[in-house]
Regions:
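Pocket-lining segment of extracytoplasmic ligand-binding domains
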Residues: 138-222
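Conserved C-terminal helix/tail region of periplasmic/extracytoplasmic solute-binding proteins
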Residues: 262-286
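Structured segments of extracytoplasmic/periplasmic soluble domains
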Residues: 43, 62, 100, 118, ...
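Short, surface-exposed recognition loops or helix-turn segments adjacent to catalytic cores
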Residues: 128-137
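Short, glycine-/small- and polar/acidic-enriched structural segments
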Residues: 2-124, 131, 150, 154-156, ...
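Secondary-structure end/capping motifs
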Residues: 193-264
Length: 286
């Protein structure tokens, strides 16, 4: 019997997906690398993919756009997403970003919300810097190396690549906000692929347990995918305790939007997260 295929779009392959792909019982994953969160939004609206792996804040922002407004986070695939604000040499503190062009994926949703909150906390006015859309993490690194912009948020291994090229670490999202959540799986509630996504969550849960119990096998899966051992170990360290999105992380995303006066500040956990697939397919209770 042929395996079912799930269509998923992401910036970089998440650890659990790489580990799950080694399991013969797993679904076939048709993965599509995207260059921006707008590509993810458009693909979900058009029904070209079944789910995306992305910043959970995107689900909040997308539900405020013209369109279906039925996006929900159905799982969380990492404990947190490590994000480093990388800048040109000589700009090693946030006050040095006044007047700077800062490269982002999108100006109103995603990881940019945490970035804006950090700048706000540092007392940098919203008219004292410019957010310049430059695409996903790889695209932002390429733009930074091409001397476009002054700073951007990067995750591993892209932050290390920027530092090796002469840029400096300016700030860490995790140091500012320890409860910052990892990437989530976002889908539309009206999607016909609900059962398919649920079956994929079963695959990811088996992978999560394997990472926890047999990290050496998880490391091998990552290295086999072409990533260095250091990247594998970093991913393994961020293995979540559960696929259920954390209430603390979601609350932080809402708090950031409230502090910044962004749409979605009146959201609550059920408006952002549909954890019923985790309950139905994995058996976890809230």
């Amino acid at each position: 019997m042929d395996k079912q295929t799930i269509r998923v779009m992401w910036f970089v392959p998440p650890l659990l997906a790489m580990v799950a792909a080694q399991d013969r019982r797993s679904l076939v994953t048709q993965s599509i690398r995207n260059r921006s969160s707008d590509e993810q939004f458009n693909a979900l609206v058009a029904g070209e993919v079944d789910a995306v792996v992305t910043s959970m804040d995107n689900g909040i922002g997308w539900n405020r756009r013209v369109g279906p407004q039925d996006f929900r986070v159905v799982a969380q695939v990492e404990r947190t997403t490590p994000l480093i604000l990388v800048a040109r040499a000589g700009r090693s503190n946030m006050s040095a970003l006044r007047g700077a062009d800062i490269l982002v994926d999108a100006p109103d949703n995603g990881f940019v919300t945490a970035l804006r909150a950090m700048l706000d906390d540092a007392g940098i006015g919203r008219d004292e810097y410019r957010l310049v859309p430059a695409g996903g993490v790889q695209e932002r690194l390429e733009a930074l190396l091409a001397r476009q912009g002054v700073a951007t948020l990067l995750g591993p291994p892209f932050d290390a690549m920027a530092v090796k090229a002469g840029f400096v670490r300016n700030a860490s999202v995790q140091e500012h906000y320890p409860d910052f959540p990892g990437q989530g799986i976002v889908m539309r509630t009206g999607s016909r692929a609900r059962s398919l996504v649920g079956a994929w969550l079963e695959d990811l849960e088996r992978a999560r347990q394997l990472v926890q119990e047999r990290p050496a096998l998880a490391r091998q899966a990552v290295v086999s995918a072409g990533l260095p051992v250091a990247a594998a170990d970093g991913m393994i360290a961020l293995n979540p305790q559960s696929l259920r999105p954390t209430s603390e992380g979601v609350a932080l995303l809402i708090a950031h939007r409230r502090a910044l006066g962004l749409a979605g500040a009146d959201s609550d956990y059920p408006a952002i997260v549909d954890d019923s697939l985790v309950h139905e397919h994995i058996g976890e209770k809230a």
